[in-house]
Amino acid sequence: FLTLTRKPAMARAGFMGAKKQWDAVSRVRDRRELDAATDSLLAALQPYGPRLLGAYETPGGLFSEPLEFLAFLFDGELRPVPFEKGSASFVDRRVSFGKDALELSGNSRSPRTLAAILSVKEYPPHTAAGQLDSLLRVPHEMVISQSFAFMDRQPALSRMNTVLRRMRAADDEALSLRRDLVQAKDDVAAGRAVFGEHHFTIMTRAANFEALDNAVADVQAALTEIGVIGVREEAALEPSFWAQFPGNGQYIPRK
């Protein structure tokens, strides 16, 4: 699943009526730009046969594919979720958070499930397409979540300038890193590259704690093979869980 999100523009201060009118215009513009970005993405992914999730009619009423996706992300069950106007409920299992694991209560369809979340502590020097394919060979159920929030040109340049100044002040001898930063600055300034904040987590599921610990160890080993240092979330377990859901960027503990 791939989700596009758009952060609405901040409303300007002013009289109540003018603010409401500006909000309405802004919503229309944001929706138009989101639709345009969606069309562009669907066209770019056309060889893979993507389709836009929506609602569908059944003899039992109207059902929502977006809500089914969120429910699948929540508890790993891909099931029909009815859509009712003014209601967007898709959760029927209680989630509890412990020291380094979470628990989804059982229900009539599924038994109790345990889960743990790993986040990226350190990235490899270089990345490439297909680098995460080795995770597909890990024999455990998992949810891999990634997000990328684009950064405007000036904030990106400002961050790189700050890092370069700190390196010079500390007399850092990492010459190759300094060269890469200078090259990256040039690419961003010339519009050849964009920068942003990347978020990457892996949630593993298991029936008991022993199986869960084994799954975490196997995933960490697979990450180490590709140069990624993964850390099992403890204090940030709950925000890491909610950060998997689209639009919850404010919960991301590591990016």
State where each predicted segment sits.
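Extended, folded cores of ATP/NTP-driven motor/assembly subunits in large transport
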Residues: F1-K255
